[in-house]
């Protein structure tokens, strides 16, 4: 049977009933837009309507992994009834089967022969293109304009970045994104827009677009992590200021032996590894160290000139700073001027920024703390 979508084009003339076929074709659109979980869900929906829908089983196989030790693609393919597949479905089945053994020769020959026999198949033309070539994506969009959301998605990247004969053009890239969104209802195109905006330093657009992607699955979404990253990039100065304050507050908590305050800045799941300015061995700093009786009393202690550097994904911060002060030995009463340079590493966790490393060393003409 031939089932046309509302726009007169479909991915595959499948072996499912009329209602299931519409769902299956939407499912392939999700595959083409790298929305595998949604494609899998569409396939399950099709099977609820038509439990003999073999194309839905192929979609589930296409959405899952071919990895032998943990993937379930083989299991999904074993459930397919080959006798009920049409010619295009059989080509797709054989291609998926070849991925189980990384048999690229069989994969490519099956696709090539399948295209010769089915030159107007949208699915096979999609699988045959080089996704990283602008011209291949444009050719598919010209042939199948109503199924080209994935092609417009890839072209948006290629136009925004330029190269391979394509001039970079951000406005045109956003036009490609709009075309993709008009053709397909899914989150990945908004993730694409966010990534392109971020690459061009527009973190406000990146954040708003990423949140649109996240909104498709507000719990457990794969898009949330980047939304958090873009928020941090957009608010980089504020985050840096808060880290500077946290570094000072943490050190004050150590000097005052304030457990509750100190706990705010460390994680129960990560060690705080410290190298003191006495240049002794590195060690894990714990509450036992915090409460240890010291050989000295601090007369003054000030941290200054803090600089903050972030990892590219905004999950880690590196702080460099200097500390000046003075302390007095409890036993002898001797006073010593203290001058060090230091660095600290903080990581972003679900419970906020936490310190995991600090390294202190005396300045060239300075003195650190004594051996404890």
Language-model region placement:
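Short beta-strand edge/turn micro-motifs at domain boundaries
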Residues: 339-369
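Structural motif corresponding to the intra-repeat A-B loop/turn of tetratricopeptide repeats
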Residues: 33, 67, 101, 134-135, ...
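Short, low-complexity N-terminal intrinsically disordered segments enriched in polar/charged residues
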Residues: 232-268, 369-372
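A solvent-exposed, acidic/Ser-Thr-rich amphipathic alpha-helical stretch
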Residues: 259-313, 322, 337
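Alpha-helical repeat scaffolds
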Residues: 71-84, 105-115, 136-148, 168-181, ...
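Alpha-helical segment of the N-proximal tetratricopeptide repeat
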Residues: 16-45, 49, 90-102, 127
